[in-house]
């Protein structure tokens, strides 16, 4: 399993198929699909496909993390280490 830890209970719940209170219901399916991609990845480069993931490294206070797009506003952010994802979170890190 590639996901070793979640940054918060909301992201963990979405991964488990739940729709937590306050979570945008219209994004649940896409978010869960993206989380499953992270979980299935054996190498970071696996997340370059499909291209609309827009895998990219983060900078500044999120240096050491990577992100993939859920939509124009939201991202799945995580730290990648030795083939596993840590501190996985669904977030709008621009706000």
Predicted regions and their residues:
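Intrinsically disordered, low-complexity boundary segments flanking structured domains
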Residues: 1-2, 24, 42-45, 55-56, ...
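Arg/Lys-rich, positively charged N-terminal/basic patches that mediate binding to nucleic acids
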Residues: 1-34
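Glycine-rich, flexible loop/turn motifs
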Residues: 2, 10, 19, 43, ...
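Generic structural signal for well-ordered secondary structure
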Residues: 4, 28-31, 47-51, 69-71
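Conserved phosphate-interacting/catalytic interface
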Residues: 38
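A short, surface-exposed loop/turn module that caps and links secondary-structure elements
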Residues: 42-66
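Enriched for short, Lys/Arg-rich terminal
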Residues: 58-59, 66-95
């Amino acid at each position: 399993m590639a996901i070793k830890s979640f940054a918060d209970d909301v992201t963990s719940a979405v991964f488990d198929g739940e729709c937590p209170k306050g979570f945008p219901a219209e994004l649940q399916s896409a978010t869960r699909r993206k989380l499953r991609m992270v979980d299935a990845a054996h190498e970071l480069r696996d997340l370059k496909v499909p291209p609309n993931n827009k895998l990219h490294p983060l900078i500044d206070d999120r240096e050491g993390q990577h992100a993939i797009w859920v939509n124009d506003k939201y991202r799945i952010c995580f730290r990648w280490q030795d083939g596993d994802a840590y501190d996985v979170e669904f977030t709008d890190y621009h706000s």
